[in-house]
Structures are given as C-alpha cells and as structure tokens.
Amino acid sequence: MPVSKKILFLAGDGIGPEVMAQVRRVMDWLNQTGRTAFEVEDALVGGAAYDAQGTPLHDDTVALALAADAVLLGAVGGPKWDASLPFELKPERGLLRLRKDLELFANLRPAMVFDALAEASTLKTELVSGLDVMIVRELTGGVYFGQPRGISALPNGERRGVNTQVYDTHEIVRVAKVAFDLAGKRGKRLCSVEKANVMESGLLWREEVTKLGADYPEIALSHMYADNCAMQLVRQPKQFDVIVTDNLFGDILSDCAAMLTGSLGMLPSASLGAADAAGNRRAMYEPVHGSAPDIAGQDKANPLATILSFSMMLRYSFDLAEEADLVDNAVRGVLAKGLRTGDIFQPGKTLVGTTGMGDALLAEMAQLAN
C-alpha cells in the first residue's frame, strides 16, 4: 500500500488552471491504479490570489505550502495586473515569496529533446537529438540578492548603479551537493560553471566545489568559465550531463539551454530546499512557460511541461522513478504518434487541444502499464 502524500496545487493565472487540470487527471489515474496515494489541496497564487484576497500570496497559503510534501504551480501573471499594481502586489511577488518562505535554493532546469521534436530546434538535428542536460542553478544568493545595491547620485551629477556578487561557503556547498547527488543518479558527470579567472566569488566557488568533489569519487567533475559554457551549449550541447552554477549565470544558461529544445511549452522545472534528517526536501515544481493569457480558456495550451514537472516531483520528492518513467515514456509515445498542441505543431502532424493531449497521454499510460 503506497504511503499517503500531500500535494499543494497552485493553479495560478492564465493557462495555469487548464494545464493543472490535466496533471490532476494523471495523478488521479496513478491513485486509482494503486501506484500512489496522493491527497491534493488547492489554493490561490498570483493575480488570482490578488483578485480574491488582496495579496498575491496569502499567509494561509504559505502555511499550506509548508505543511505539504510538495507544491505544484501552474503559472502566474498577466497584463491585467501589470500596469495597475504596485511592485510588491504584482502576481510574480507571490512566486518569489513562496521560494523565499520555503527556503528553496536549488533550481533544477532540465533541457530535454524528445526525438519526435528534434527538428523543432534551431540547431541541427544531429546536435540535439537525444539531448538531456540538467542545469542546477543557485537560487537565493549572488548578485540578485547581494548588498549593497541601488542607484545613487554622485557629486559630479552622474548616477551610479551598484549590485554586489557575494557567496558564502555554505551557499555554494549545499547547491553543489544537490548537483553531485543528481549526477550520481544520471550520467555521473558534473560541470561546475563560474568566472574564476576574473571574479573572487567564482574562485571561491571553484575551490569549494573541488573540495566537495573529493566526497564523490565516482563523479567526473570538470570546471568551465561561464562564457565558454554558453558557447559550448550551442556548439556541442550533448557533452554536458549536469551543470551547476550561480544565480546569474544559471539564469542565463538555463534559458540558453531551453531554446535548444525548440519549445518552452515542453520544459519543466523544480526548486528544492535543504534535506531534513529523513532526507526529505521542501520542493516546488512548475513549468518554465508563462501564463499565456492570450490563449487562456481556449483549450489551446500545451500541458506537457506541467505534466513533466509532476514527473520530476515523482522522481525527486517521492523517489517514484518507475512512475516518473511511465509518465515520461507516455509523453514520448504521444509525440511519436504525431500529436501536437499549437505551440509545437508541425505540418503533417495532428493538432490537439489541452484536453485532447491529456486524453492521449492517459491512454498511452494505460497501454504502457499493460
């Protein structure tokens, strides 16, 4: 009998509720077939939360997130709230507060190319076919949070903008541990990325990751400067297995890697916190794509990135590799059969909507399970 686990669903804005509804169908199928015992609570976040509760993230929702075994988020934001709200009430602030209050410091951004979609990439098919890279980005430190920061007036009439790139040892070590552990479950290769040639924070990063590498003799550790890494991702992306890097470089490199795949509608992500004594981590999972308000409510959204985010949850929060593989292989199956939502549509393929993609995925899962 599977152990009961609590998941908090935060559908959010735009296409969020539609894509999350398809995840609920996948989860219900896993529950009904006796593979899992998930309990779901629903709450509001982003613009939907502001409209109903006057804040992009209510304290009660934070409490639910802290009590849950994992959080799954749809999407937040949209033009409805962009111009009218002060910065601290914008939908995206709800997401940032969630990450902060859950103490999520490691952002996992996989860049996978399914064989059926290899031609959608802007790179040559042979460069990206079979690509499976995982970028681990430090999420709560570095230049986005370092002090001092700000814009000040100078005596000569000019203005000065200051941001501070700063990392302490523990911030580097904890995210590097996540990356080493991931590499151990994948291809046993880890590339640490910084600018140790010109930045002291990068030099400290390299020294600490190298020291930690002694605890992981089975992992082949390499180091690369961030500018070279960006070039290599475009030149020969399949040389990488797991990449670990800081907040700024991770922000840039993960978006670079995302476009190797051809569609943001296919990309999941995870954000992880520290492990407790039992090895459990606070975690939030979400698709990389935005809320796409222009197609919301029209059954046009691609649910696969959110479904693949749920697959990451199965794998990394609940250690259910077999169930995660089932979901991943079902996604491969429906794509191989030529089913496409509008964002990944190609001539000669079959156009389906959000619900139609969900129908096909459930049928594929049932077929694979038998």
UniProtKB/Swiss-Prot annotation:
<keyword id="KW-0460">Magnesium</keyword>
<comment type="pathway">
    <text>Amino-acid biosynthesis; L-leucine biosynthesis; L-leucine from 3-methyl-2-oxobutanoate: step 3/4.</text>
</comment>
<feature type="binding site">
    <location>
        <position position="137"/>
    </location>
    <ligand>
        <name>substrate</name>
    </ligand>
</feature>
<feature type="binding site">
    <location>
        <position position="255"/>
    </location>
    <ligand>
        <name>Mg(2+)</name>
    </ligand>
</feature>
<keyword id="KW-0560">Oxidoreductase</keyword>
<feature type="binding site">
    <location>
        <position position="109"/>
    </location>
    <ligand>
        <name>substrate</name>
    </ligand>
</feature>
<feature type="binding site">
    <location>
        <position position="227"/>
    </location>
    <ligand>
        <name>Mg(2+)</name>
    </ligand>
</feature>
<dbReference type="GO" id="GO:0000287">
    <property type="term" value="F:magnesium ion binding"/>
</dbReference>
<keyword id="KW-0432">Leucine biosynthesis</keyword>
<dbReference type="Pfam" id="PF00180">
    <property type="entry name" value="Iso_dh"/>
</dbReference>
<comment type="function">
    <text>Catalyzes the oxidation of 3-carboxy-2-hydroxy-4-methylpentanoate (3-isopropylmalate) to 3-carboxy-4-methyl-2-oxopentanoate. The product decarboxylates to 4-methyl-2 oxopentanoate.</text>
</comment>
<feature type="binding site">
    <location>
        <begin position="290"/>
        <end position="302"/>
    </location>
    <ligand>
        <name>NAD(+)</name>
    </ligand>
</feature>
<dbReference type="GO" id="GO:0051287">
    <property type="term" value="F:NAD binding"/>
</dbReference>
<keyword id="KW-0963">Cytoplasm</keyword>
<feature type="site" description="Important for catalysis">
    <location>
        <position position="195"/>
    </location>
</feature>
<feature type="site" description="Important for catalysis">
    <location>
        <position position="144"/>
    </location>
</feature>
<keyword id="KW-0479">Metal-binding</keyword>
<keyword id="KW-0464">Manganese</keyword>
<feature type="binding site">
    <location>
        <position position="99"/>
    </location>
    <ligand>
        <name>substrate</name>
    </ligand>
</feature>
<dbReference type="GO" id="GO:0003862">
    <property type="term" value="F:3-isopropylmalate dehydrogenase activity"/>
</dbReference>
<comment type="similarity">
    <text>Belongs to the isocitrate and isopropylmalate dehydrogenases family. LeuB type 1 subfamily.</text>
</comment>
<dbReference type="GO" id="GO:0005829">
    <property type="term" value="C:cytosol"/>
</dbReference>
<keyword id="KW-0100">Branched-chain amino acid biosynthesis</keyword>
<dbReference type="InterPro" id="IPR019818">
    <property type="entry name" value="IsoCit/isopropylmalate_DH_CS"/>
</dbReference>
<dbReference type="InterPro" id="IPR024084">
    <property type="entry name" value="IsoPropMal-DH-like_dom"/>
</dbReference>
<keyword id="KW-0520">NAD</keyword>
<keyword id="KW-0028">Amino-acid biosynthesis</keyword>
<protein>
    <recommendedName>
        <fullName>3-isopropylmalate dehydrogenase</fullName>
        <ecNumber>1.1.1.85</ecNumber>
    </recommendedName>
</protein>
<dbReference type="InterPro" id="IPR004429">
    <property type="entry name" value="Isopropylmalate_DH"/>
</dbReference>
<comment type="subunit">
    <text>Homodimer.</text>
</comment>
<dbReference type="GO" id="GO:0009098">
    <property type="term" value="P:L-leucine biosynthetic process"/>
</dbReference>
<feature type="binding site">
    <location>
        <position position="251"/>
    </location>
    <ligand>
        <name>Mg(2+)</name>
    </ligand>
</feature>
<feature type="binding site">
    <location>
        <position position="227"/>
    </location>
    <ligand>
        <name>substrate</name>
    </ligand>
</feature>
